[in-house]
Curated annotation (Swiss-Prot):
Binding site for a nucleoside 3',5'-cyclic phosphate 1: 174-301
Catalytic machinery residues: 983 (nucleophile), 1103 (proton acceptor)
The species this protein was found in: Drosophila sechellia (Fruit fly)
Pfam annotation, one family: Patatin
Motif (GXGXXG): 954-959
Biased composition (Low complexity): 1374-1383, 1419-1441
EC annotation from Swiss-Prot or TrEMBL: 3.1.1.5
Gene from which this protein is expressed: sws
Annotated keywords: Developmental protein, Endoplasmic reticulum, Hydrolase, Lipid degradation, Lipid metabolism, Membrane, Neurogenesis, Phosphoprotein, Transmembrane, Transmembrane helix
Keyword Hydrolase belongs to the record: yes
InterPro entries the record matches: Acyl_Trfase/lysoPLipase, cNMP-bd_dom, cNMP-bd_dom_sf, LysoPLipase_patatin_CS, NTE, NTE1_P-loop_dom, PNPLA_dom, RmlC-like_jellyroll
Subunit structure comment from the entry: Interacts with Pka-C3; interaction inhibits the catalytic function of Pka-C3 and the esterase activity of sws.
Protein name: Neuropathy target esterase sws
Matching PANTHER family: NEUROPATHY TARGET ESTERASE SWS, NEUROPATHY TARGET ESTERASE/SWISS CHEESE D.MELANOGASTER
Family: Belongs to the NTE family.
Length: 1468
């Protein structure tokens, strides 16, 4: 609110709302009389009270004298009683009755209307006069400091492991995946090296064949440049290693290398553990699965650590790969070469090789003599220029626009069934051999020295024998895979040939389905990567060229070994012929020859540049458990860290010992980069919130790359600039007193979310499905339960031996999805503990209308994940129209909760159905579009960092425009996730958060505005104007009547209000406490209302608009936000006693505060007044008489000079104006100002008119935004495509591939429990309160559920029958259309498919004793066992089918009896 505007209105006599100008003059003249009158009244009141107390005392004295006289008379009549005394028991009885009698009298006086009534009346009158009334203090939120473990690292060592073994486990990631016997065998080969200062650990020309781990001391690793200078890469300290895992592959593949540029020297006396790489040979011979797993881990490290650090953060792409490799021969044949060579030339860079005349080629092959040559065979283009700019797929006549393939089955067209020697040109969409007869033919020869010889024979008919080409491709791929000639029969059935036209896409980046190993026979392939440079993203969005693949080279080995998606996009650069082997075929070959993984890995390593090898020595792959510190405060900063997975927390320790959260880092963030560049000590301590993986980039390596590749400096400047701009936008307002924990620069975008139920009554599965449904609109999301993981990875996946498989699989799922939901079990199982370790945030789900007590299971969750952020989610049924209440009790009982959410649930969430029914129900729900205005969508946007905030500014009666803008926002389809307000905006925002119904909000706002126009109420509220004109009592009553005793915590939508704390001289943000009080404080305009005294600390709070004009019981903070200085008194906070005034003095549009609280997109509505900036330049001095003359002389030109109140008002709003300009210039806020300047601050009688102005303006504004395409970030930020139906029980489309498990057929012992396959909850179906979950002796089972509902609800019986009929039809169609199972299908997959089929039919197999499902243990070791298992499963299925038929008949008979029994009873 504006003091200047009110004074001007008073001077002009144009108020017409509260008081007139004549009345103001009367008050100014009679001020002395008013003082005397009030003093006389107070003196009379004091005299009356003194007389009353004196009269009571005199009456008590007279009564005492009468009692004394009566006692003395009785004593004289009875004689001398000095020798008598009372017994102790009598004394106790006497005094006890006396005290009880007094207590009874006092308690009776509290409610009686007789004795003491006059005294109570006088005291009430005195309290009213002297304002001695004491408010009933509401329930306060307990401010509990987080536990010490939340901000402290874990400092615990492992005393049971020897130091050398512990350093080996910690330093090199691959050792962590060895089993204990294998690791102990490796330890036998270790050697201890003692080095003095200056001794070389290794130097140039030494063999690179060992792993070095520093046990004590320090080692310096540096590189030698060509000019003789050296540059340090890193300093290796205690527990760290010096090794290159790429050299590890060279040694194992039989191609050991030497140190060419890297040297290691001891800085001080050191002890180093040396482990020869040859020691692994002995282990790998006996354990081929260990070899495959080690190679896979090395390749994953190469892709996730080296490529991630060098590409995404240093801007290096093509520098990582050698682009000029020596051409290899495709095939070597003996025979003379036709000497009719017209010319010999090099192949053109962009032109395809010509076609060879096979007549001469066959003659030379038949002769069997001649020198070795290389023959390249391909087809020339008919018009190269016509095809050079468009992409084609190989099998689809209508290819995708991007040239990508449609899937694995359509990726390549089969040549001719399974025949490997079929004619290549007899495929669809390809020209026949006859088309080649009229074309120009040529021969391209490649000599052993790499030169090309091209012979052109125009007009000669070609006759190509594809069997020769097939044989050449098989021989070349056999050599690339390191197989002998005797192994040709293994690879021959899987080799396929294809001809490519220019710009045909073989695989796209991020595709995991079309991974193959491609061998180029003729032509050239180009390898691309997406442009990751943020600075050039808007200018150049095309893919970046990495390198070319020439004839004789192989590509695709990295994605094949890692089992992950392809990191590159591969296209044909010219007409080319390739030979390839699919992923499934490669894995089948690996089963027979596991050592091909070494040759595939060696092929990948040969392609890498020397820079990658040097970086491999310096970069480290670190795995941290929860609570472990990355670095500590005040340590030297010699490296930076990249978060690959997990979550980190930065904590600063102040000089007094107090610790504070500085920030949190998630996947992809760079930690410690600023300190490393500035060469300053660590300012904070960074620790792992959960199990995390990091890549360590030393300072020496960073400097070496920076000198060699200056583009790194540009990338670094861009990165630091974005971080600096982000910190500048979030700096203001974050450090103010009263700011919550969320105000810290902590990111609110989570990758993993764990869902924990408080009790068994919580419908956790429907809740997870609803949240999953809302998250699917934002991006790819995955829902995981214990049963889903078991079905995918085996029932024994949670055992310690399978730790690597589980963690790798979960990490891969997290990389693929923007968010992963971990649904915990209802007990503290192994899966629940795993969820706690993987979660970035834990959602504790409870029922809002139930008891708030903390259970034992919930306390265990807090103990397991002390450092993980926890948020409370309270569910409310929509049918009961219940509103949140008693939220403070929930939060006070759980001090570890940092945030809470109220979620209104539809009826289907609380349905009492079995797990199968719930899965089937949500399989249909997931096909629909989610409601973006629901509470689940609001929660989904919060978890993914896409929340939409609404900020309402202050402006007095002009705030009625907020109601119209709210209606326009609702009609525009914009969801509101967070609301903040100042002054009148605090009132309107609180109304919306409380009801979320525009009709109800409008009615309440209109009623409050009408109360503000009643003059007689304002006259009764007048007081002596020392602090303010009004006492604020009636104003408080209007706000309290509007909200009642509601707390901010009980609002549906997260809400905050902003006030000006005149006690601490800053603004305060209120996110909890009394609503009406803080709204009143935010409306306390200086001079009209006294500041509100904060009950927390006693600080005086004014209108928050003085510092920020755009931003418990609820009404108190609303009242505090409306404490206009001078009009209403400051409101005293009931928590600390601070005085609160209107928030408009500090920040009238607190959009920056909303941004700090986590809102990504903000709509800010400003209705405040605007100051006149067109003032008169009056020179160096100013005379008041001159101004008076100008004012009263109508013949002179008017001047605009601010008067004293105007100057004071402008000074008060200096901070607010500066803050408003920052909000207008920000990129995260949409600033809107309706045209309401003609309305006065106190024109509350024009509510409907101002509201209509705001509605019309808002409607037109959002329509124009929609036409301009700017409305999408508010109401169309999610994916509008209809969701696709997915199978949530399995993850067949993309899963982690454990080569050791697949290739070596490891014995996997698992339990086939048919009871586990029927539901996702291993404990029970449905709720625990259902009779079926507790009755374990029931032998009868439901088959096809003919006419019966598992929920025992009579109203659902018909729908269940219809659903079963649909399921039966679907099963019949699927069984008829499904192809026969391949012979290479894994046994585990067959079992799951059969049991899942039985599950869909509703069959639960239990033994005759009723003890549950029979558990059979199987072991996969060979083809014989597979056949035996197949026969057993078929027999088991037949037995189940026969038993099912019997049970169906039996159930039908019982159903008929049950249905007929009620009719018989009614007849009887």
């Amino acid at each position: 609110m504006d003091v200047l505007e009110m004074l001007r209105a008073s001077a002009s006599g144009s108020y017409n709302t509260i008081f007139s100008d004549a009345w103001c003059q009367y008050v100014s003249k009679q001020i002395t009389a008013t003082v005397y009158m009030y003093c006389a009244l107070v003196m009379m009141s004091l005299l009356f009270i003194a007389w009353f107390l004196y009269f009571k005392r005199m009456a008590r004295l007279r009564l005492r004298d009468e009692l004394a006289r009566s006692i003395s008379t009785a004593t004289n009549s009875s004689g001398d009683l000095r020798g008598l005394r009372f017994r102790k028991r009598d004394k106790m009885l006497f005094y006890g009755r006396r005290m009880l009698r007094k207590v009874k009298n006092v308690s009776g006086q509290m409610y009686s209307s007789g004795k003491g009534y006059k005294r109570r009346a006088v005291m009430r009158f005195a309290r009213r006069i002297l304002q001695l009334r004491r408010d009933n203090m509401p329930l306060e939120m307990r401010t509990v400091e987080p536990p010490a473990e939340y901000l402290e690292e874990t400092i615990e060592g492992s005393d049971r492991v020897p130091p050398d073994a512990l350093y080996m486990l910690q330093s090199i990631r691959i050792f962590g995946h060895f089993e204990k016997p294998v690791f102990l065998r490796l330890c036998k080969h270790t050697q201890l090296l003692e080095l003095m200062a200056g001794d070389y650990l290794f130097k140039i020309t030494d063999p690179d064949d060992s792993v070095y781990i520093v046990q004590s001391g320090m080692i310096n690793v540096y590189i030698s440049n060509a000019d003789g200078s050296t540059l340090s890469l890193k300093t290796v300290r205690k527990g760290e290693s010096v090794t290159s895992l790429l050299s590890f592959i060279d040694v194992l593949s039989g191609n050991p290398s030497y140190y060419k540029t890297v040297t290691a020297k001891a800085i001080e006396k050191s002890v180093v553990i040396r482990l020869p790489m040859q020691a692994f040979e002995e282990v790998f011979q006996d354990n081929p699965d260990v070899m495959i797993r080690v190679i896979q881990v090395i390749m994953i490290r190469l892709q996730r650590v080296l490529f991630t650090a060098l590409r995404n953060y240093l801007g290096l792409n093509a520098e990582l790969v050698q682009n000029h490799m020596r051409y290899k021969s495709v095939s070597t044949m003996s025979g003379p070469i036709n000497s009719q060579t017209s010319q010999s030339s090099r192949q053109a860079p962009n032109g395809p090789p010509m076609v060879i005349n096979q007549l001469n080629l066959m003659q030379s092959a038949a002769s069997g003599t001649g020198s070795g040559v290389s023959v390249t065979v391909t087809r020339p283009p008919s018009s190269p220029s016509r095809h050079s700019r468009e992409e084609h797929t190989l099998s689809d006549p209508n290819p995708n626009p991007d040239g990508s393939f449609h899937g694995t089955t359509n990726l390549f067209t089969e040549v001719h069934g399974d025949a490997p020697n079929a004619d290549l040109f007899q495929q669809q969409q390809q020209p026949s051999v006859g088309n080649l007869s009229t074309r120009r033919s040529s021969i391209t020869l490649m000599t052993p020295d790499g030169s090309h010889s091209c012979v052109q024979t125009p007009g000669v008919t070609t006759s190509i024998d594809m069997r020769l080409v097939q044989s050449s491709a098989v021989d070349s791929l056999r050599k690339e895979l390191g197989l002998s000639e005797e192994d040709s029969h293994i690879i021959e059935p899987f080799v396929e040939l294809r001809e490519l036209e220019p710009n045909v896409t073989l695989i796209t980046e991020g595709n995991a389905d079309d991974v193959c190993v491609w061998f180029v026979m003729t032509g050239t392939l180009a390898v691309y990567q997406s442009n990751q440079d943020a600075t050039r993203a808007k200018q150049d969005k095309s893919d970046m060229l990495i390198h070319f693949v020439h004839p004789g080279e192989i590509v695709g080995g990295l994605a094949m070994l890692t089992g992950e998606a392809s990191a590159y996009t591969i296209r044909s650069r010219s007409y080319a012929r390739i030979a390839f082997i699919r992923r499934a075929a490669i894995y089948q070959i690996m089963r027979q020859r596991p050592r091909i993984v070494l040759d595939l890995g060696n092929g990948v390593v040969r392609r890498l540049s020397p820079l990658v090898r040097q970086c491999d020595y310096a970069l480290d792959w670190i795995f941290l458990e929860s609570g472990r510190a990355v670095y500590r405060q005040d340590e030297s900063s010699d490296s930076t860290y990249i978060v690959l997975s997990g979550r980190m927390r930065s904590v600063i320790t102040h000089p007094g010992g107090k610790k504070e959260i500085v920030g949190e880092y998630g996947k992809g963030d760079l930690v410690g980069i600023v300190e490393m560049i500035t060469e300053t000590s660590r300012t904070t301590t960074v620790m792992a919130v959960r199990d995390s993986e990091l890549a360590k980039l030393p300072e020496g390596l960073f400097n070496a790359i920076k000198l060699r590749y200056p583009i790194v400096v540009t990338k670094l400047i861009s990165f630091l600039s974005h971080r600096f701009l982000g910190s500048m936008q979030t700096r203001s307002g974050s450090g103010a007193p009263g700011a919550p924990v969320e105000a810290n620069p902590v990111t609110h975008k989570y990758s993993t979310v764990a869902l924990v139920p408080i009790t068994d009554e919580v419908p956790l599965t429907p809740f997870t499905y609803e949240l999953y449904h809302s998250l699917c609109a934002i991006g790819p999301v995955l829902r995981l339960t214990s049963d889903v993981v078991r079905k995918q990875l085996g029932s024994n996946i949670f055992e310690a031996a399978n730790e690597y498989r589980l963690t790798s699989w979960l990490a891969q799922q997290e990389d693929r999805n923007i968010i992963t939901l971990y649904q915990c079990d209802s007990s503290l199982s192994a899966w629940t503990q795993r969820c706690m370790r993987q979660a970035d945030v834990i959602l504790i789900v409870g029922l809002g209308d139930r008891s708030h007590l903390v259970g034992k299971f919930e306390r265990e969750i807090d103990r397991l994940a002390m450092r993980t952020q926890k948020e409370l989610v309270l569910l409310y049924p929509e049918a009961t129209n219940a509103k949140p209440a008693n939220t403070l009790s929930w939060l006070n009982a759980r001090p570890w909760v940092t945030k809470h959410h109220h979620v209104l649930c539809v009826k289907r969430i609380f349905t009492r159905k079995s797990q199968y029914r719930i899965n089937d129900l949500y399989s249909r729900v997931l096909l629909s579009e989610p409601n973006m205005h629901s509470d689940f969508s609001r929660l989904a946007r919060w978890l993914t960092g896409n929340s939409i905030g609404l900020v309402l500014g202050g402006g007095g009666a002009r705030g009625a425009a907020h109601i119209g803008m709210l209606k326009a926002i609702q009609e525009a389809g914009i969801p509101v996730d967070m609301v903040g307000g100042v002054s009148i905006g605090a009132l309107m925002g609180a109304l919306w958060c409380s009801d979320r119904n525009i009709t109800t909000v409008t009615q309440k706002a209109r009623e409050w505005s009408k109360k503000m126009t009643k003059w007689f109420l304002q006259l009764l509220d007048l007081t002596y104007p020392i602090t303010s004109m009004f006492s604020g009592r009636e104003f408080n009553k209007t706000i309290h009547d509007t909200f009642g005793d509601v707390s901010i915590e009980d609002l549906w939508i997260p809400y905050f209000t902003l006030t000006t704390d005149i006690t601490a001289s800053c603004h305060r943000i209120h996110t909890n406490g009394s609503l009406w009080r803080y709204v009143r404080s935010s409306m306390s305009l200086s001079g009209y209302m006294p500041p509100l005294c904060d009950p927390k600390d006693g600080h005086l709070l004014l209108d928050g608009g003085y510092v920020n004009n755009l931003p418990g019981h609820l009404w108190r903070y609303c009242r505090a936000s409306m404490s206009i200085a001078g009009v209403f008194p400051p409101f005293c906070d009931y928590r600390d006693g601070h005085l609160l005034l209107d928030g408009c003095y500090t920040n009238n549009v607190p959009a920056d505060v909303m941004h700090n609280l986590g809102a990504a997109h903000i709509i800010a509505i400003d209705v405040g007044s605007q100051d006149d900036t067109d003032l008169t330049n009056y020179g160096d001095d100013l005379s008041g008489w001159w101004l008076l003359y100008k004012k009263w002389n109508p013949f002179t030109s008017p001047v605009k000079v601010p008067d004293l109140p105007d100057i004071q008002s402008r000074l008060a709003y200096v901070s607010c104006v500066r803050q408003l300009e920052e909000v207008k210039n920000s990129d995260y806020c949409e600033y809107i100002r309706p045209p309401i300047d003609k309305y006065k601050t106190l024109a509350f009688g024009s509510f409907d008119e101002i509201r209509d102005v705001g509605y019309v303006f808002g409607k037109n504004y959002f329509e124009n935004m929609a036409k301009a395409g700017r409305l999408g970030r508010f109401n169309q930020w999610f994916n509008k495509e209809p969701p696709k139906r997915v199978n949530h029980a399995s993850l067949n489309e993309y899963t982690f591939i454990d080569l050791a498990q697949i290739v070596c057929r490891l014995p996997e012992t698992y339990a086939v429990n048919t009871a586990e396959l029927f539901s996702e909850d291993e404990d029970c179906d449905g709720y625990i309160s259902e009779p079926t979950t507790l009755n374990t002796d029931r032998r009868r089972i439901q088959v096809s559920r003919a006419g019966n509902s598992l929920s025992f609800s009579e109203t659902e019986m018909d729908s269940d029958v219809e659903l079963d009929l649909k399921l039966e039809r679907k099963m019949d169609k699927s069984t008829q259309s499904s192809p026969p199972t391949s012979s290479r299908t894994d046994m585990r997959g067959k079992e799951e498919a059969k049991h899942m089929a039985n599950w869909h039919w509703g069959v639960k197999h239990k033994d005759e004793t009723g003890s549950g499902a029979t558990v059979a243990t199987h072991t996969q070791t060979g083809q014989e066992q597979e056949l035996q298992q197949q026969q057993k499963l078929q027999q088991l299925q037949q037995d189940q089918g026969a038993r099912a038929e019997q049970l169906v008949d039996k159930d039908k008979e019982e159903d008929k009896e049950n249905r007929s029994s009620p009719n018989n009873e009614t007849k009887n």
